């Protein structure tokens, strides 16, 4: 590196949340443009997206330097918000690992305080593998110097001790008096301790426009740094940097040497390569393959003995297993398959049912025999090469579906099995979207105007109007509101949050903290600072444990019906009664619960599992070209009879990805591995790979064709074009088979166990619409749904098989506390004589140290939950007097009418001229209620309340007059008219 260039090492991207609007690629591109040879990223407190940054630097021929701007504290306990800044840069790969671990430590609950922090003791123990630089005006050196104002070598012990641990002292070029003063102090300190100076820019924006966007982003969040207008934090060229120092008046020789020290520092850093090898789990060392083989033998024999598999096809099973084990050996996947088998076996042993299969793994015989899936490829014709092949370049993964309420148990199993530092969740970046950007800009413009003492009309109301106009006419809206849209493009897509990706968890044979770092999120979980795409690039194994509501509905139905969760071999997949009933209602019918999907299924009239897969594929974008013809049961004709025969189960239509593999494998003679690779190449528009395989494809096709070569080649090319045209959207048959099984199982249970099924469905309803559909279905089946009642209802819906009654659960009521049912159950157990007793017990009874809140109690009263103690008006009156007196220690006579004084007197332990005290409040309220005239019930109000909170009406327990009430209800809005 030469002296007329430099290295930017103190640099922030949008990953330094709310402190930048610049993406890292902009910086790298600019560095390359300026001929700079290295770059470091020093985000606040962590190394977010560092793998992505490293990969982009490598691709652009620039050295990536691993770094962080960490926070230091003088004491971890008691917590003090000092949070000094210091730059750490990795000198070599050991330094990379050290910084990674330090970032993880800093995020621990005992360290974190507003920011992830390290103690000074931890800082002082950092090894020589890490370059330590003093950073900006938030450095401990500046803070202590500002208060002490020591000159030259006259330093106190504090400054001396910390200064000696820095490899460089950072001077900055900003046109700010305090910065200039601090620079001169650092120059003196450098002379005293022979610590070299280095120039840091504290860059936060690629250019002035992005700097303005950064300011607006901060204004929108009420962040306002004092005096920052004097700091130019944009990316500088070498000449621009020198010009800035000229304005400071520093000795030219000093700042030029400090600038060149960035080059010397960067040259001292050893480059390193990312480890992109497959990181499959290793369970038993070199014995993994042997243990997997023994597991397969054991489970195969168990299935054969139980009659689950057809032993007449033993050779077919053996050939498939042999082929798959060979592939797993070549790609190093044996330990992974073994772990999945052991994990899912553990799930079943612990009453955690798993969906039949999710994704392409449904094509693996090893997966079926080892209980990873419950889809037998020999029975269902699923394809292994779609799941894995020996030339696979991407890490394999297996997704599983579990009940949402058991998902955390499976994740914990993985963590326990691999260890905390070998497991972590994945980073998810939340970005500023269009509507949010408009809101933030309008908010920032108001803040900016208020700061300047100006009027501003960018209200929230105007922001809403702008968003609506923007959706209708983007170009016109941009012209109408130029101030807003000046910033819009520069803020759109900016990272504004970092959280846990919902997809899954990483488990690795290598220590994730050392190799990649991590941070502790608000839920106490370890999250890698790496995006999903880079997880695949570095070939870490991701375990997707997805919570599927229908698996939970099936599980809960089976529990209520007292039957085991059905396995695929136990189900009659050709039950005509189930197929006929399936198209009578969409309720609980997995993948066909929407009106459109169900209507399509009804029109098709399925009679076999493949029909469900076909309809499911057809309603997706790829099905647009053949949807109507398929639903009309037309047969499609392809370029040849061979292809027609291949696609006969699909009525001749190209529907599934596996159809492409079958064409290339069965007709064109490619291996399963080559066939899947060609399919992937077509899907990714990698036409060069297709062209290289084309001679083999055409040769194989022509060899199996009885037509002249020119005709056969034309047929093959025509079908390849059909494949290419639909490749972006084709559905997976392996995946669809498992999911159609779930749909059929729901239909089967709904038909044979309707009471239990609808109870489970209601307990798992996610929306008011689901509850309404479930309630309607129950009534169509002749079941009675009773409103929640004191002494009968639980948190969930419960069913009574003898009376065919379903009691609504309190947990399904919006705004109801989740502890309400438990509290009511405990109160009921104390046998309260009346509603007054209930109210006073509510003060004493707690669950998780919490009482039932006022809102939940109001809802329970409003829906008639306590109807055994009186009608709605009576209970509200009791509640009124309870609220008036229950918490009062004394009652002043001046606040009471004479009749009330007469009732209070016998219930008071003490009486003075002005007040009563030591009052028996329960008895007082009962006495008050006893002398008040009785009110007729307000049935109209009760009906309104039930429609609002329950979605239906149940007033059966109420003693009402002969008036008849007619209720006309459309969802929650109800028109109630009284007919005399």
What are these regions (language model features)?
Residues 7, 40, 66, 197-199, ...:
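Residue-level marker for buried hydrophobic side chains located in beta-strands
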Residues 1-15, 23, 27-39, 65, ...:
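Conserved active-site carboxylates
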Residues 179-183, 207-218, 368:
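Histidine/acidic-residue-rich catalytic or RNA/ligand-binding cores of hydrolases
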Residues 46-56, 178-185:
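Active-site-adjacent beta->alpha loops and helix N-cap segments on the catalytic face
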Residues 11, 44, 68-70, 203, ...:
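Active-site metal-binding loops of divalent metal-dependent hydrolases
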Residues 32, 58, 124, 163, ...:
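Anion (oxyanion) recognition and catalysis
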Residues 38-41, 57, 205, 216, ...:
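Noncatalytic, beta-rich nucleic-acid-contacting surfaces in large DNA/RNA-processing enzymes
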């Amino acid at each position: 590196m030469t002296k007329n260039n430099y290295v930017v090492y103190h640099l922030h991207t949008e990953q330094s949340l709310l402190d930048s609007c610049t993406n890292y690629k902009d910086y790298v591109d600019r560095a390359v443009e300026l001929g700079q040879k290295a770059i470091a990223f020093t985000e606040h407190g962590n190394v977010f997206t560092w793998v992505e940054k490293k990969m982009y630097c490598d691709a652009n021929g620039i050295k990536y330097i691993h770094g962080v701007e960490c926070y230091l504290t003088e004491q971890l306990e008691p917590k003090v918000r000092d949070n000094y800044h210091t730059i750490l840069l990795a000198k070599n790969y050991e330094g990379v690992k050290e910084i990674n671990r330090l970032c993880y430590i800093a995020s621990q609950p005992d360290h974190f305080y507003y920011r992830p922090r390290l103690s000074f003791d931890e800082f002082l123990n950092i090894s020589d593998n890490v370059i330590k630089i003093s950073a900006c005006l938030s450095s401990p050196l500046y803070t202590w110097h500002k208060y002490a104002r020591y000159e030259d070598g006259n330093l106190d012990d504090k400054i001396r001790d910390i200064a000696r641990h820095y490899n460089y002292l950072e001077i900055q070029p900003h046109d700010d008096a305090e910065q200039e003063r601090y620079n001169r102090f650092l120059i003196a300190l450098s002379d005293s301790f022979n610590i070299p100076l280095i120039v840091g820019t504290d860059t936060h924006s690629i250019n002035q426009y992005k700097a303005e966007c950064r300011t607006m982003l901060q204004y929108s969040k009420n962040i306002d740094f004092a005096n920052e207008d004097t700091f130019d934090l944009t990316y500088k060229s070498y000449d621009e940097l020198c010009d800035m120092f000229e304005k400071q008046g520093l000795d030219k020789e000093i700042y030029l040497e400090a600038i060149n020290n960035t080059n010397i520092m960067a040259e001292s850093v050893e480059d390193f390569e990312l480890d992109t090898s497959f990181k499959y789990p290793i369970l038993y060392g070199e014995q993994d393959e042997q243990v997997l083989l023994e597991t397969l033998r054991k489970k195969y024999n168990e299935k054969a003995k139980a009659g689950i598999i057809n032993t007449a096809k033993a050779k077919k099973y053996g050939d498939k297993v042999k082929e798959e084990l060979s592939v797993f050996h070549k790609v190093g996947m044996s330990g992974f398959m073994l772990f999945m088998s052991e994990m899912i076996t553990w799930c079943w042993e612990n009453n955690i049912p798993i969906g039949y299969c999710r994704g392409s793994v449904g094509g693996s015989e090893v997966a079926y025999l080892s209980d990873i899936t419950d889809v037998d490829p020999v029975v269902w014709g699923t394809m292994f090469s779609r799941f894995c092949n020996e030339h696979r370049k991407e890490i394999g993964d297996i997704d599983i579906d579990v009940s949402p309420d058991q998902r955390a148990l499976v994740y914990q199993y993985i963590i326990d099995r691999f260890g905390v530092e070998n497991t972590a969740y994945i980073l998810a970046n939340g970005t500023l979207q269009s509507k949010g950007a408009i809101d933030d800009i309008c908010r920032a413009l108001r803040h900016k105007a208020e700061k300047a003492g100006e009027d501003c009309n960018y209200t929230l109301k105007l922001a809403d109007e702008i968003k609506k106009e923007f959706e209708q006419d983007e170009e016109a809206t941009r012209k109408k509101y130029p101030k807003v849209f000046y910033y819009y493009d520069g803020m759109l897509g900016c990272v504004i949050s970092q959280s846990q990706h919902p997809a899954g968890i990483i488990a690795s044979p290598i220590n994730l903290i050392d190799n990649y770092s991590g941070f502790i999120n608000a839920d106490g979980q370890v999250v890698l600072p790496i995006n999903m795409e880079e997880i695949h690039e570095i070939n870490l194994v991701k375990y997707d444990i997805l919570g599927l509501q229908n698996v939970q509905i099936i599980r809960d139905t089976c529990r209520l019906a007292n039957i085991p969760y059905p396995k695929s071999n136990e189900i009659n997949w050709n039950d005509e009664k189930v197929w006929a009933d399936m198209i009578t209602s969409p309720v609980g019918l997995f993948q066909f619960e929407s009106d459109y999907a169900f209507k399509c299924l009804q029109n098709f009239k399925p009679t076999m599992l493949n029909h469900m897969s076909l309809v499911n594929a057809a309603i997706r974008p790829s099905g647009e070209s053949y949807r109507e013809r398929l639903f009309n049961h037309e047969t499609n004709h392809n370029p040849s009879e061979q292809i027609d025969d291949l696609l006969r189960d699909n009525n001749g239509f190209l529907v599934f990805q596996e159809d492409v593999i079958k064409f290339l494998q069965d007709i064109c003679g490619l291996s399963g591995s080559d066939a899947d690779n060609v399919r992937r190449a077509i899907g990714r528009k990698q036409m060069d790979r297709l062209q290289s395989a084309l001679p083999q494809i055409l040769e194989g096709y022509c060899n199996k064709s009885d037509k002249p070569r020119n005709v056969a080649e034309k047929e093959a090319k025509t079908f390849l074009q059909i494949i290419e045209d639909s490749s972006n959207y084709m559905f997976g048959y392996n995946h669809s088979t498992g999911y159609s099984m779930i749909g059929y199982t729901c239909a089967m249970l709904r038909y044979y166990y309707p009471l239990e099924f609808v109870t489970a469905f209601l307990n798992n309803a996610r929306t008011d619409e689901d509850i309404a559909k479930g309630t309607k279905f129950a009534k169509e089946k002749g079941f009675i749904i009773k409103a929640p009642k004191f002494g009968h209802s639980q948190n969930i819906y419960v069913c009574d098989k003898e009376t065919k009654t379903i009691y609504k659960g309190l947990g399904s009521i919006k705004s109801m506390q989740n502890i309400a049912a438990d509290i009511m159950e405990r109160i009921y157990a104390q046998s309260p004589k009346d509603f007054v007793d209930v109210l006073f017990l509510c003060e004493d009874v707690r669950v998780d140290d919490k009482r039932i809140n006022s809102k939940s109690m109001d809802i329970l009263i409003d829906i008639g939950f306590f109807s055994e103690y009186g009608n709605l008006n009576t209970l509200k009156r009791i509640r009124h007097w309870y609220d008036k007196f229950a918490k009062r220690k004394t009652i002043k006579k001046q606040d009471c009418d004479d009749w009330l004084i007469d009732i209070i007197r016998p219930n008071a332990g003490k009486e003075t001229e002005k007040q009563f005290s030591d009052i028996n409040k329960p008895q007082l309220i009962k006495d008050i209620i006893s002398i008040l005239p009785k009110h007729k019930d307000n049935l109209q109000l009760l009906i309104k309340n039930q429609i609002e909170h329950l979605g239906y009406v149940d007033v059966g327990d109420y003693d009402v007059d002969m008036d008849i009430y007619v209720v006309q209800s459309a969802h929650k809005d109800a028109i109630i008219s009284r007919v005399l």
